[in-house]
């Protein structure tokens, strides 16, 4: 590495030790210690919130174009250090070279520039009053930042999800207290380093590290005005309950139905399923968690998927030709093993490709899966492809909608009318037609229904969530005779 790995907390512009000591971060592929990272406590969170509160008025008063210039500078510095950040992603969370570079180059770094561009377009409205029969009133709708926003992000896209959230939150004039996942603190600190180097004032971005208690301290703090969280549905529900009247945006679990109808391009659908199920070893909220394949093409699809999975190169994520690396932690591994073995016990046929060693879990295809199995009802978050045979479109829709989750779905068909009707019928925030479930666009709204979250993120939808609308009413005070509502019976 060109520089020593950053391991401290960032509070009010200074890199500081955590009051709780340190905690270790280990490589998922080798188990080797990468670094000991600052362990924060509720006191550190309080100091971070205090710093964010003190910095927020000045940051909000900073001319918009000056804030945007800093966003652009963050992007430029991030792009310059992109390969360095990508290499840490490989070591810290086990992404392959291609996956790490894609996260940093295609998503994380550009997010800062895109947020700066978007905030320039976040305009208000001016309109006349409709409540009086004079021309005295002018109404102006503006946006003001919420204030201090708590940001809690996961390990699977640590620089991407955080950059998208923080860039929009900060560009809008808010300040932030950020708790990255304890499984990805180092690459997140690199993002914070870039922000400070680019000229972000002290206190605008604060970073605290630790376990769930640190996140809870952010959520519980009375001086935190809004909350952003990406992670599990269970944790999201607890955050929503504590958020109460505070604005919050939650992106939670997914049920990932991939529906392959009888008229689908089978080869394309197989490639889509490979990406949906095995990209970053399935540790993606938009992963294909269940494949609903029509009986007419089921056998051909399964045969081709198995042939393709058998070619998957699994191993050291630091090698350029590796296509799938390890799971990030033992909890994820335990859930994957539990779901697969329960399905096996209930009659599913299991085919696996690759070794199960340490946190490496083989690419796994399950046939004979039924909708009642846990692996078909819950988010597994691993490299699994559970296949359910369907006989009709209504059956596919019913199974896809049977989950309480509804983040994203993938539908494969050649018929436009079918795509339109099924797309409308699926109760998911996004339906990708003839595209992997892992596709999303930074300028389109992203979010789910049901237990998959609250609100929509990306682009203008982020700015709407983390600003408040404010109405200014002007009486121009001219000499026109005012309309007398009482005299006319209006009141």
Where do the protein language model's features map onto the residues?
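Conserved C-terminal structural/oligomerization subdomain of aldehyde/semialdehyde dehydrogenase
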Residues: 30-35, 224, 259, 313, ...
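Rossmann-like NAD(P) dinucleotide-binding subdomain of oxidoreductase/dehydrogenase enzymes
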Residues: 127-268, 390
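Short, well-ordered beta-strand elements within core beta-sheets of diverse protein domains
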Residues: 33-40, 55-61, 150-151, 258-261, ...
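ALDH superfamily catalytic-core signature
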Residues: 234-370, 433, 481-482, 488-490
